[in-house]
Amino acid sequence: MNAKIENINGITNITKKKGVPLKILQLTDIHIGGSFSTRKKDKLALQAVEKIVNASDADFVIVTGDMVYPIPWLLQGSFNNLKSSKKFAACMEKLGKPWTVVFGNHDSEVWATANKKKIGDFYASCKNCYFSHGDENVTGDGNYHISVLNEDGTLNTVLMFIDSNAYLTWNFFSGFDIIHDDQIEWYKNTIKIIGAECGKKPEEVNSLAFFHIPPKEFREAWEKFYRGDKSVIYHHGFVGEKDNYFGYPKTVEGKFFNEMVKFGSCKGMFMGHDHLNTLSLTYKGIRLTYGMSVDYLAYKGIDKRHTERGGTIIEIYDDGTFDTKMLPLDDIEHKSFFETGR
């Protein structure tokens, strides 16, 4: 481990070693069904998680939502999302890495037996999990932060975890929700307080945001890049969803991205939700990155696909800059085959 993680009085800090990048692994969209009929695909998903985590050599693992999939029809997932969450957590705990999560739109569907509060209580009780419910007066569940410190105790980066919520009403057909205005204010206030403690202006505090549902500006950035706009910087990945789909909220206008551009602290946003998208672009000074997904269940035929499955490595350096790279499961399995014959 190239980092030390401490939680003192509910405040979590990660202290990185000097001269060695802090290595974070982003996982997303695991989609454990938790029923008898999904047991084979659940096993594949958990085996994939184990392979990716072990291959990553990460100091910390962040899962950006949809750990479980309590959809009882067609795909026959279990109503019991707590049971499914426990299956996922058991896998993570066995691997022994420190980890945390944010909620996706599927983690607590309206017909599921446990709400986000109950699921969050369970995650927070896990020995190696650093999930926090955050401020109960802010929209959602799980708006919290973890500070990354340099070896000398100075602030490096703030990891901001945000509940991007689920649907506008109670179901999928109402459309996806947004990060709400009070969550944006919570983000700003958190950075202002941390900055004041170390004598920095908000724009001098580097922060990275982790959530599930992408903002519409990711699509905007991709369209500009596709048309040859040199102001958009391509890093890696592709858009694999049919008709170049981006699953951002279509019926309500979110302000999060533009407010973060003006605020100046946020340098990167990491999300999931669209399982076949692995794109990473920098737009208006913010790096937007889809994590590689794990899902074997939610998309028809996705268990036969390979190019989107894996993890995303985020390396944070001494000066607070960072970089990302894809960690495809195919590469891990091919390397294992050539080294061991299995």
Predicted regions and their residues:
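Divalent metal-coordination and catalytic microenvironments
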Residues: 29, 49, 61, 66, ...
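Short, flexible/disordered intra-domain loops and linkers
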Residues: 37-41, 72-81, 111-114, 172-176, ...
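His/acidic metal-ligating clusters that form di-metal
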Residues: 56-60, 158-161, 173-274
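Extended active-site neighborhood of metal-dependent phosphoesterases/phosphodiesterases
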Residues: 2-16, 78, 82-202, 296, ...
